[in-house]
């Protein structure tokens, strides 16, 4: 599924774990995102703290609207974003949807 198609979706309650093939297909549409353990993660770099925090606030807005919240590690010029569906015990379509929405915030095509 393409990045724009993923980003256009909304999260669904009680999403099941993604099968490996579907996870691999979705990851192919998410530039720079990695599957590690039971999560998707990516680091985003910025020129300064102001831009870093603006991105964090934008991610918070998306997470609130989707009711799907990432773990964030905030640094001076970097944000590490980790999505996992804890209730499902790993990665679901909701994680891919939110990763695509976050990717769109960062300005990827």
Task: Indicate where each model-derived feature is located.
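Charge-rich alpha-helical segments
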Residues: 1-109
């Amino acid at each position: 599924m393409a990045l724009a198609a993923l980003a256009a979706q909304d999260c669904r309650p009680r999403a099941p774990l993604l099968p490996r093939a579907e996870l691999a297909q979705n990851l192919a549409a998410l530039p720079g995102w990695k599957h590690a353990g039971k999560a998707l993660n990516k680091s985003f770099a910025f020129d300064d703290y102001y831009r870093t925090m603006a991105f964090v606030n934008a991610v918070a807005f998306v997470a609130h609207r989707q009711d799907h919240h990432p773990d964030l590690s905030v640094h001076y010029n970097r944000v590490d974003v980790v999505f996992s569906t804890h209730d499902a015990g790993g990665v679901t379509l909701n994680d891919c949807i939110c990763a695509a929405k976050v990717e769109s915030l960062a300005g990827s095509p």
